[in-house]
Amino acid sequence: MPKQTVALFFGGKSVEHIISIISARAVASHIDHSRYDITPLYIDRGGHWHGGACAKRILALDVAVLLRNGGQDEVFERLDEITSFDEGKRFDLTAFFDSIDVAFLTLHGSYGEDGKIQGCLDTFDIPYAGCGLTSSALSMDKALTKLCAADAGVEVAGFMSVTSADYAADPQAICNAVTERFAFPVFVKPANLGSSVGISKVHNAAELRPALDKACALDAKVLVEETITGREVEVAVLGNDDPIASVPGEIIPGSDFYDFEDKYVKSDAKLVIPADLPGEVSAAVRNAALTVFKALGCSGMARVDFFVEHGTNRIILNEINTIPGFTDISMYPMLMSASGVEFDELISRLLLLALEKRAINPKI
């Protein structure tokens, strides 16, 4: 059987740009090269597409080391230096799509995980690993995710959503509404970002406005959410119509909560796989993950995050990620590995699921 060509999309316009590159490097190292050839496609922070030698040079760049040693500024300086050689060149989108068989996306966050790139690929009839346009868009919006999950019978934390426009018009009114509805501490988070970017834990009224300022600067919609005192547990889901759920894994944060630094830079968080949960709680978490996955119409992959409340073992949805991290310290591949699906096999299965979905739904 001839090799198939996989377009590996990475980079993107979101604040998770660097993490996307790290994920892409891991995927490239674990793909079955006897079955697939990789054609990298790098999207810079301005949304410009770069293929060929430019994308290959960036994929070869060990940005994780640069990030640890020099911070984000040094990473972006190197990326800009490489892409400068592509200035003035016109990317031939049609020729690129004509040359590939299937796409694998490691575009985390906005403009990658929210349905935009999925719609583009659908237009060009390119199969891709992971969720489609609608499920991606729903899952990206934390408020809509909670509404869909609650409708399917999965418990969610109490929350209120605030538009950045309403907050800008009357910040004090929004702050008053929050303090009337919730007891502190609360979490303030952008509705459409991942990797814990822009999230603040607010302990009192004095901290509320700075947290809202921070989140509203990053997103047009913001969530204020009650704090759940419990264990942070995650489940990886893999499949299309008959998905499987991994063993649950627990995150013990190295800071006040599992933030961007814990996930990708200093790695102080402790990951426990499988999570030390009673058997019935573990089974219930896995079932809840499958329920959320199906309620949102997901396909291919997702990581579903929960809280297991101290004392009661109530299972409460936190969020879902339809393009979870694929770095060497990311939960999704580690959870699947602990469930018998190693990283190399995981990539192959995701690509096969993409082709399977297109075969069943040729017009989608």
Swiss-Prot record:
Binds 2 magnesium or manganese ions per subunit. It is found in: Cytoplasm. SUPFAM superfamilies: Glutathione synthetase ATP-binding domain-like (SSF56059), PreATP-grasp domain (SSF52440). Mg(2+) 1 binds at residues 305, 319. Pathway: Cell wall biogenesis; peptidoglycan biosynthesis. Keywords: ATP-binding, Cell shape, Cell wall biogenesis/degradation, Cytoplasm, Ligase, Magnesium, Manganese, Metal-binding, Nucleotide-binding, Peptidoglycan synthesis. InterPro entries: ATP-grasp (IPR011761), ATP_grasp_subdomain_1 (IPR013815), D-Ala_lig_Van_CS (IPR000291), D_ala_D_ala (IPR005905), Dala_Dala_lig_C (IPR011095), Dala_Dala_lig_N (IPR011127), PreATP-grasp_dom_sf (IPR016185). The keyword Isomerase does not apply. ATP binds at residues 179-234. GO terms for biological process: cell wall organization; peptidoglycan biosynthetic process; regulation of cell shape. One of its GO terms (molecular function) is D-alanine-D-alanine ligase activity. Mg(2+) 2 binds at residues 319, 321. It comes from the Bacteria. The keyword Magnesium applies. Its cofactor is Mg(2+); Mn(2+). GO terms for cellular component: cytosol. Its main location: cytoplasm. It catalyses: 2 D-alanine + ATP = D-alanyl-D-alanine + ADP + phosphate + H(+). Its EC number is 6.3.2.4. Residues 146-352 form the ATP-grasp domain. HAMAP family: Dala_Dala_lig (MF_00047). Cell wall formation. Belongs to the D-alanine--D-alanine ligase family. This is D-alanine--D-alanine ligase.
